[in-house]
Amino acid sequence: VVPILPLFDLDILHTTVSGLEKHIAAFIEHKNYTNIHLLGNSLGGHVALVYILKHPERVKSLTLTGSSGLFENAMGDSYPKRGDYEYIKNKTAQTFYDPAVATPELVDEVFEITKNRIKVIKIIALAKSAIRHNLGEELNQIQQPTLLIWGKNDIVTPPFVAEEFKKLIPNSQLHFIDKCGHAPMMEVPVEFNSILEKFLGSLSK
């Protein structure tokens, strides 16, 4: 089940990591899901961390990949620059090890978002919220088995971030994937799924 995060649908006051977590919590409550295997990438990982800290009784395992919550490089300088297609194209490509993963369709989608002033304001609000909402001092409370899958070439949440998550989350294991950036599930789906399936399989034994 992949719930859509309402990145642009919440009012500006609730366009935060906590606001997104409340949305996910309400969805899980509505569906009455328990024994959840929770997985999140980037900001989604941050939301998953806040959720598991608030509702540990509902979660069986946690998988993070390129997660914010400790450190993130945001998108650097003055992102997002509105109306500069080449800039957006380059920034989108930097998310991945292989720039070809940033297809014209994906770049067009990002570019359309950056042309919308309200959406840009909400992206900036979420980025600032993620930086403020550092979870370093709370991660030792997570007792569930945790899988960390990280691209060795991630420049948004670099490998040292994964090492820090590994150090702070007690029952965690870390797998680096070579020649991979910030989105392993998109860049190397076969390897990503293989690591994930092995982890989930070990929990059912």
PLM region spans:
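Flexible "cap/lid" loop of the alpha/beta hydrolase fold
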Residues: H46-K54, R58-N90
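Alpha/beta-hydrolase active-site loop signature
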Residues: L5-D9, G69, G181-P184
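Catalytic active-site module of serine/aspartate enzymes centered on a nucleophile-bearing elbow/loop
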Residues: S172-K205
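Conserved alpha/beta-hydrolase catalytic His-Asp/Glu region
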Residues: R82-Q143
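Short beta-strand/loop motif that positions the catalytic acidic residue
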Residues: I142, L148-W150
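Active-site loop/oxyanion-hole signature of alpha/beta-hydrolase fold enzymes
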Residues: V1-L39, S194
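Short alpha-helix in the alpha/beta-hydrolase fold that links the catalytic acid
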Residues: Q144, P158-F165
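Acidic catalytic loop of the alpha/beta-hydrolase fold
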Residues: N153-T157
